[in-house]
Each structure stands twice: as structure tokens, then as C-alpha cells.
Amino acid sequence: MLVIPAVDMKNKKCVQLIQGNPDKKHVELDNPPEIAKKWVNEGAEMLHLVDLDGALDGKRVNDEFIEEIIKKSGVPVQIGGGIRSIEDAEYLVEKGAKKVIIGTIAVENPEIIKELSKRIGSEKIMVSLDAKDGKVVIKGWKEKTKYTPVQIGKILEEMGAGSILFTNVDSEGLLNGINIEPTKELVDNLKIPIVASGGVTTIDDLLKLKEIGVYGVVVGSAIYKNMINLKDAIEAVNKSN
């Protein structure tokens, strides 16, 4: 299982938001490429980049940093935030992204995944599913859909999604631990890899997620607030059977 550090960018800074709220930040640091390098030096084998300006208002102000991280980090990068068209996804793959993370547009129109998989290949498509109170939410968690994560997950898998990034919004950014059940349901019901995100605060949380069979876990606030030491976490996960 991979432990994947998050580098979330807003206005050319590295930030960690509380429950996705742009006005509530746990962390705000300069120079995202330096932060990315620090995580790789501590053993990260993959990075999770999020362009929050792209996600929140469709502006691509962090491209320069994104390209620098892709070029210089030396590890594969999965990237999301503001990918609202097939062209946006193709642009990031051309720049060297290993996976592009598609959110709202995939849930609203799963057919787009079929088209995208023809263009860039399934293995490069990661669909982001965010759930609140058992239902998938879209548009920056503002709008609740009628689907459960498993229902939409199966549709997206059929359409050609290569993996799922699953965030349990109820736990995200609150630093009070994880609820394993919704993630386990996805792992048990889908064939494609599931990457978990949201609420991880201890190495024990990571080991529980490894136990249920997730492919990777995105860690954010906990490593920025020094609740988890990344190097120790990666070692613990690699040692556990």
C-alpha cells in the first residue's frame, strides 16, 4: 500500500483546508515544489497534487509549480482540481501526470470517462468520489446526489475508470480519525484500485486501511501538523503483513 502525501496548492502556496473550506486553513506554506521534494526525500513513492484555485474557481494559477513538481520530483504524480474537460485532462497527461483525477464531471456524466479512456487510457483516469452521510457529493461538496459510492463506482468502473479516489467528507480535515466502513464497501464491491483519503491521523489508521485492501492512502493535514511522521508511516506500512 502506498502512503501518498498531498500537496494542495492555493494562490501559489501549499495549504491544508478544514473540510474543504477555502476560508479555513490548518496550514499555509510557501514554495510547494520544496514541500513536494521534502516528502519524496522522506520516502514518498507518489505525490497527490491538488490545484485548489482550479477546483474552486476554475483558474489555473499554479501550473508553473505543477509542472516543476512533475519534472523534478522523480516520482509519479496524481493530480486533480479544476479538470473540467477532456482537454484539461489531456493537457496534464502531456505535462507528465501519471494519473488525472476527475470529479464532478464524471459523476454528472459518466460517459465522459468512456471517451477519456479511449484518448488517454484507463490507467491514467482516477475518479474522485466524495461522500457525505452515505451519498456522493459534487461541486466542492455543495451538492448531494442520489447515488451511494458503490452505485456510482460500479458505473464508472464499467465506463473505464482505472481507479477511485474516495474521500469520506465527514472526516476530511477534522483530524479526528477515520470511519473505515464506507471505504471497505467500495473495496469489497469494485475490482479497480481504491485510494482512500480524509481523516487519517495515526499510523494505526493507515494499517487499518491496508488491512481492508486499499491500494493507497492520501495523507494531508496529519503530516503537516506533525501528527504522523511520513518516514515512520511508510516504514510501518511496508513492514506490516
Swiss-Prot record:
HAMAP family: HisA. Pfam families: His_biosynth. It catalyses: 1-(5-phospho-beta-D-ribosyl)-5-[(5-phospho-beta-D-ribosylamino)methylideneamino]imidazole-4-carboxamide = 5-[(5-phospho-1-deoxy-D-ribulos-1-ylimino)methylamino]-1-(5-phospho-beta-D-ribosyl)imidazole-4-carboxamide. Its EC number is 5.3.1.16. Signal peptide: none annotated. CDD domains: HisA. The keyword Hydrolase does not apply. It is an enzyme of class 5 (isomerase). GO terms for biological process: L-histidine biosynthetic process; L-tryptophan biosynthetic process. GO terms for cellular component: cytoplasm. InterPro entries: Aldolase_TIM, His_biosynth, HisA_bact_arch, Isoase_HisA-like, Isoase_HisA-like_bact, RibuloseP-bd_barrel. This is 1-(5-phosphoribosyl)-5-[(5-phosphoribosylamino)methylideneamino] imidazole-4-carboxamide isomerase. Pathway: Amino-acid biosynthesis; L-histidine biosynthesis; L-histidine from 5-phospho-alpha-D-ribose 1-diphosphate: step 4/9. Belongs to the HisA/HisF family. The active site is at 8 (proton acceptor), 130 (proton donor).
